Amino acid sequence: MEKKIPRPVIKRLGLYYRCLNRLYEEGIEYVASKDIAERLGIKSSQVRKDLSYFGEFGKRGVGYNTYELMERLEDIIGVNKYWNVIVIGAGNIGSAIANYEGLRKEKFNVIGIFDADRSKVGRKIGRLIVKHFSEIDDFFKKNIVEIAVLAVPENAAQMVVDKLEELGIKGIVNFAPVKLRTNIPVEDVDITLSFKSLSFKIERNIE
């Protein structure tokens, strides 16, 4: 039976990977859990505990080989290959994501953006042209699509998800403020939670 990995651990893996990337670019060959922890503002014991879910890493007294650990995390996270992404919803959030070049650098390649509003169809967003949602079947026939970003109104979200699941999408990043009914992996994003967390820290003078 596969070990269940807590969600906070999964989120921190991406932070570790980004940190190691920067360390490698700085020419640092070996790194200790303490070094990673200090850069991320967490405890070194947390770094070691998180990594232990996936096996043994590093050598006592030497630390981790930066490049080797980065490669291992690439395999674990799944960023050792490119993922094709589409965006559903060409409003402010959807347009910003489709136009964000940082995703491509992290191996998430946005290849299409769709909307049901015909007034938005044909608009150019970055290097993409907005297509009508009715064209999505044909798009899936011609392209391999693995991840969808959902940036649609709450009342349209479930209908869109049902269609995407029918087409064989593998995962969804959901910006709609609704719990989706689906059997595929979903990552819900609510930016208001970050603001609430920040206001909590400000009120209590927490770093």
Swiss-Prot record:
Which organism was this protein described from? Thermosipho africanus (strain TCF52B)
Instruction: Extract one GO cellular component term from the record.
Output: cytoplasm
Q: Which SUPFAM superfamilies match?
A: NAD(P)-binding Rossmann-fold domains, Winged helix' DNA-binding domain
Q: Which domain of life is it from?
A: Bacteria
- Is Cytoplasm a UniProt keyword of this protein? yes
Pfam families (UniProt xref):
CoA_binding (PF02629), Put_DNA-bind_N (PF06971)
Predominant location of this chain? cytoplasm
Q: Which HAMAP family match?
A: Rex (MF_01131)
User: Function of this protein?
Assistant: Modulates transcription in response to changes in cellular NADH/NAD(+) redox state.
Q: Which residues bind DNA?
A: 15-54
Positions contributing to NAD(+) binding: 89-94
Subunit structure of this entry?
A: Homodimer.
Family assignment from sequence similarity: Belongs to the transcriptional regulatory Rex family.
Q: Which one GO biological process term can you cite for this protein?
A: negative regulation of DNA-templated transcription
**By what name is this protein known?**
Redox-sensing transcriptional repressor Rex
Encoding gene, per UniProt annotation: rex
Localization in the cell: Cytoplasm
Which keywords does this Swiss-Prot/TrEMBL entry list? Cytoplasm, DNA-binding, NAD, Repressor, Transcription, Transcription regulation
Could you state a single Gene Ontology molecular function term?
DNA binding
Write down the Gene3D superfamilies for this protein, in alphabetical order.
NAD(P)-binding Rossmann-like Domain, Winged helix-like DNA-binding domain superfamily/Winged helix DNA-binding domain
TM spans (from-to): none
